[in-house]
UniProtKB/Swiss-Prot annotation:
GO terms for molecular function: S-adenosylmethionine-dependent methyltransferase activity. SUPFAM superfamilies: S-adenosyl-L-methionine-dependent methyltransferases. This is Ribosomal RNA large subunit methyltransferase M. Pfam families: FtsJ (PF01728), RlmM_FDX (PF18125), RLMM_N (PF21239). It comes from Methylococcus capsulatus (strain ATCC 33009 / NCIMB 11132 / Bath).
Length: 352
């Protein structure tokens, strides 16, 4: 078998520098030398390993869920350039057969840019004949690697694989969520995606009858996600809340400052989408956690224009330092979700 020579990462357009910085930190920590190729506004980054065999041997040390800005991470070969127009399939199949013996499924993808989306008609047309030709490599079962073909143009592509338990479960790393008609704002999709990304035990972590606090709740997009799961919610905001949420019987609206409010007793969930300096939000969440005021928290950090990766790591440090001083066991993750913009979403779980 051939070792993958690179790591392909999808990201939000404009965040290539941050995505490149964190994959360099992660690979260096694993003792994997290489360099990155990151073109501004391309919506993808490539880490090129200097020694592919070391990348293959140490790939298990590179956890996808530890990355912040990557939507998807693919162990890849390539790029395959100048694919013959009359036979793109053969070189792609040869490369796929060299990387893995069997795959569970096939995803043809492009970058999340307007320019790359012009390839959509080509990939739709190409998918059926390529899948038919690759049938002998597919059908490896749900735990087999996924086969990805990432088209740069109609004649150039990266080909690689992801492992189902260490990757995003959606093509292009993008969950296709539909805005519910009754939701008060589009921000509701951020919390829905956050639950999909961070909550690995929904039957126990998002049970009906749980309690929550939503800081900066108005007009109620995040509260709506809690109410639809029958979670009793205290919505804290000086602004107006969607009347339908109040009619649900599950919401108490408090017109007060989200930074001053504290619940009289611990709640199951804290969610926070207040527009404020990221370090101030991080300290607020750390204060609640140090007091044992919640079990789980989802919060957004609005990022500055510059040094965005460094700012997230600074906020991570603020939370980690405070909880370490209090002896609070926890799990902390960050991810720039598809429905995030100039922000990242944090998830904090207190471990008893």
């Amino acid at each position: 078998m051939t070792s993958p020579s690179s790591i392909l990462l999808y990201c939000r357009r404009g965040f290539e520098k941050e995505c490149a910085a964190e994959i360099l930190v992660q690979t260096q920590a694993a003792g994997i030398s290489g360099h990155v190729r990151a073109k501004e506004n391309s919506a993808y980054v490539v880490f090129v390993a200097h020694e592919p065999e070391i990348l293959a041997n140490r790939a298990a040390r590179l956890r996808f869920d530890a990355l912040i800005f990557a939507r998807q991470r693919i162990f890849a070969s390539g790029p395959l350039a100048d694919l013959p127009v009359d036979d793109r399939i053969t070189p792609l199949l040869d490369t796929a057969a060299g990387l893995q013996r069997r795959y569970s499924t096939l995803w043809l993808e492009t970058a999340d840019t307007n320019e790359a989306k012009e390839l959509a008609a080509f990939t739709r047309k190409f998918e059926r004949p390529f899948a038919a030709a690759a049938a002998g490599l597919l059908g490896g079962g749900p735990q087999a690697p996924r086969l990805h073909v990432f088209f740069l143009t109609s004649t150039a592509a990266y080909l690689g694989y992801t492992l189902p338990d260490d990757s995003a479960p959606w093509p292009c790393g993008i969950p296709r969520l539909k805005l519910p008609r009754s939701a008060p704002s589009r921000s509701t999709l951020k919390l829905e995606e956050a639950f999909l990304v961070f909550v690995d035990r929904p039957e126990t972590m998002l049970r009906p009858g749980m309690s929550a606090v939503d800081l900066g709740a108005a007009p109620g997009g995040w509260t709506w996600q809690l109410v639809r799961r029958h979670i009793r919610t205290t919505a804290v905001d000086n602004g107006n809340l969607d009347p339908a949420l109040l009619d649900s019987g599950l919401v108490t609206h408090l017109r007060t400052d989200g930074f001053r409010f504290r619940p009289s007793r611990p709640v199951d969930w804290l969610v926070c989408d207040m527009v404020e300096q990221p370090s101030r939000i991080a300290r607020l969440v750390a204060d609640w956690a140090a007091d044992g005021a919640f079990r789980y928290a989802v919060f957004n950090l609005k990022l500055p224009m510059n040094r965005r990766y460094e700012e997230v790591e600074r906020c991570r440090g603020l939370i980690e330092e405070r909880l370490a001083a209090q002896g609070v066991s926890h799990r902390l993750r960050f991810r720039q979700l598809y429905h995030d913009r100039e922000e990242v979403t944090g998830f904090l779980e207190l471990v008893s």
